[in-house]
């Protein structure tokens, strides 16, 4: 599908990290002495290890720098490391893999798409852009209902649960990030369409701000709150403040100015009272005053 699953267990066979870690005896058994020595130099493997006496393989520098340091031809080093990794990968494939949670969550896929799009733009990597673009198209196809609203998640191809504000906010940010790579109008049009949807379903038309759940949610909804605090992920209202500014800069839609102003006003007292709980919202406010601060 080209989308991202939600989670993987850390342990397998009752041991945390077992699938991913390596012991020195194991590496010595699998590799020739020269290959093992080269692996140790490139990945800084020692007796102490870096995870409970064993090692999570972590390349210490880019291969070009390592080739210079070791006095080796760059192409030769790349080939050697590729062969070593293929050997270790084949052996690891025989291990019991951690359980994979195959739910596809709109919010989290939006975050991954945005990350790949940003990397594509900054690193000039076409392959990263293709990954992001394909995932975005898949999400829009699989997680968009007939009425245009979003589903929050899917499992085994079956979509369910009406999207939350965070799903819209992160996917909208992803579409904007994709537009920024090549200025393809398709992504900006998709972003503007999603913006219209989130304004219709989540925007408090009386007091401003975005509700966590759609106002037309099916099923009982006794209280519909507005959340501004960042937790493990960014709050939907903070993300939307950034999105509104980004859309204004790219589309010139003047109505966005009013939404931005009201979004800041409605949460000003809450953020002033407890600023440390809403750093991303404050970053958005700073961007209004000082310009884009995303790279700070």
Residue ranges and their predicted role:
Residues 1-296:
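Glycan-recognition and catalytic cores of secretory/periplasmic carbohydrate-active enzymes
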């Amino acid at each position: 599908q080209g989308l991202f699953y939600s989670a993987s267990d850390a342990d397998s066979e009752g041991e945390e990290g077992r699938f991913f870690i390596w012991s020195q005896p194991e590496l010595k058994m699998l590799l020739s002495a020269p290959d093992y020595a080269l692996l140790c130099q490139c990945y800084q493997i020692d007796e102490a290890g870096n995870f409970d006496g064993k090692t999570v393989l972590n390349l210490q520098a880019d291969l070009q720098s390592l080739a210079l340091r070791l006095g080796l031809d760059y192409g030769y080093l790349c080939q050697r490391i590729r062969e070593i990794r293929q050997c270790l990968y084949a052996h690891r494939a025989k291990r019991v893999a951690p359980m994979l949670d195959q739910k596809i969550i709109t919010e989290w896929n939006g975050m991954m798409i945005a990350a790949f799009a940003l990397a594509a733009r900054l690193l000039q990597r076409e392959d990263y852009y293709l990954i992001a673009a394909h995932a975005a198209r898949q999400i829009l196809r699989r997680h968009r209902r007939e009425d245009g609203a979003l589903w929050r998640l899917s499992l085994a191809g079956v979509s369910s649960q009406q999207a939350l504000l965070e799903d819209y906010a992160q996917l909208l940010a992803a579409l904007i990030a994709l537009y920024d790579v090549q200025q393809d109008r398709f992504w900006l049009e998709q972003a503007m369409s999603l913006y219209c949807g989130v304004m219709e379903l989540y925007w408090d038309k009386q007091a401003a701000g975005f509700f966590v759940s759609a106002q037309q949610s099916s099923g009982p909804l006794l209280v519909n709150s507005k959340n501004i605090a960042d937790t493990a992920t960014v709050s939907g209202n903070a993300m939307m403040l950034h999105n509104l500014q980004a859309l204004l800069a790219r589309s010139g839609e003047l109505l966005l100015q009013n939404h931005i102003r009201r979004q800041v006003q409605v949460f000003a007292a809450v953020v002033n009272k407890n600023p440390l709980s809403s750093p991303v919202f404050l970053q958005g406010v700073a961007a209004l005053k000082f310009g884009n601060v995303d790279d700070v």
